[in-house]
């Protein structure tokens, strides 16, 4: 039986809305499969090649990361993977803290005994802390839709570090500088210019040259009275 994408999308939406709400204890199990199905599934995170199942994976808010699934069909009938989902669980209690968006995909059919793989991108916007990531696959098998839950992976969600060379930050800095420069120019024209004009220093006039001072080094005796000259000569004789 084939399932159309709209039907699968409706099923996934109904599952996310009600499956864990109907059975709170189910959300605490982060390792067991939801159904008994001979279908082995594992996954890795390609951009973290050194992170194993027991290691801590670090991912960042606002950035996409890829989950690469690998699986083997050990049933005696075909199995089709028709959707992906999952959840981030609390590390201590196992309770669901956030669901991955359940999304239908183009069916990946796996015949009995066959293995396969595919990748799915995930984007994050979570409170930065440590979680248990538990991906899920939605399987079409034996005329029914079933859920297969993969293993849990310790995952730490972080905010992206801010860099001074970040283009968005540089643009913001340029806008702020232009804004402050504009405000400073307006303030100067309204208040500053008047203030500086009102307190400008007045230049003092330059002092004129001092009038010449008469000296007694040389005296023209033609205009002196005769008595004065005679008196002067008498003093010299004495």
From Swiss-Prot:
**GO cellular component annotations of the record:** endoplasmic reticulum membrane
Where found? Endoplasmic reticulum membrane
What is the name attached to this protein's record?
Increased recombination centers protein 22
Its predominant location is: endoplasmic reticulum
Coiled-coil annotation reads: none
Matches recorded under InterPro entries: TRAP_alpha
Keyword Signal in the entry? The reply is yes
Q: Its biological function?
A: Is probably involved in a pathway contributing to genomic integrity.
Chain's gene name: IRC22
Q: Which spans are transmembrane here?
A: 170-190
Q: Which family does it belong to?
A: Belongs to the IRC22 family.
Signal peptide as annotated in the record:
1-21
Topology with regard to the membrane? Single-pass type I membrane protein
Q: Which residues lie on this side of the membrane: Lumenal?
A: 22-169
Tell whether Nucleus is among the UniProt keywords.
no
Q: Which domain of life is it from?
A: Eukaryota
Q: Which residues lie on this side of the membrane: Cytoplasmic?
A: 191-238
* Keywords per UniProt: Endoplasmic reticulum, Membrane, Signal, Transmembrane, Transmembrane helix
What Pfam families does the annotation carry?
TRAP_alpha
């Amino acid at each position: 039986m084939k399932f159309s994408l709209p039907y699968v999308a409706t099923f996934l939406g109904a599952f996310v809305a009600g499956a864990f709400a109907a059975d709170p204890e189910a959300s605490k199990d982060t390792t067991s499969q939801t159904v008994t199905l001979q279908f082995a599934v594992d996954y890795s995170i390609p951009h973290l090649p050194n992170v194993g199942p027991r290691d801590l994976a670090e991912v960042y808010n606002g950035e996409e990361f890829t989950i690469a699934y690998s699986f083997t069909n050990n049933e005696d009938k075909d199995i089709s993977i028709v959707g992906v989902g999952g959840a981030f669980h609390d590390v201590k209690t196992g309770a669901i803290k956030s669901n991955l968006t359940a999304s239908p995909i183009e069916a990946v059919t796996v015949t009995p005994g066959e293995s396969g793989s595919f990748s799915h991108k995930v984007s994050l916007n979570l409170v930065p802390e440590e979680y248990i990531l538990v991906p899920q696959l939605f399987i079409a098998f034996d005329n029914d839709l079933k859920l297969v839950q993969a293993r849990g992976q310790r995952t730490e969600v972080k905010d992206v570090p801010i860099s001074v060379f970040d283009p968005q930050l540089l643009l913001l800095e340029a806008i702020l500088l232009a804004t402050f420069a504009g405000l400073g120019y307006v303030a100067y024209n309204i208040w500053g210019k008047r203030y500086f004009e009102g307190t400008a220093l007045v230049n003092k006039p330059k002092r004129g040259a001092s009038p010449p001072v008469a000296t007694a080094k040389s005296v023209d005796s033609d205009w002196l009275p005769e008595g004065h000259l005679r008196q002067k000569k008498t003093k010299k004789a004495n």
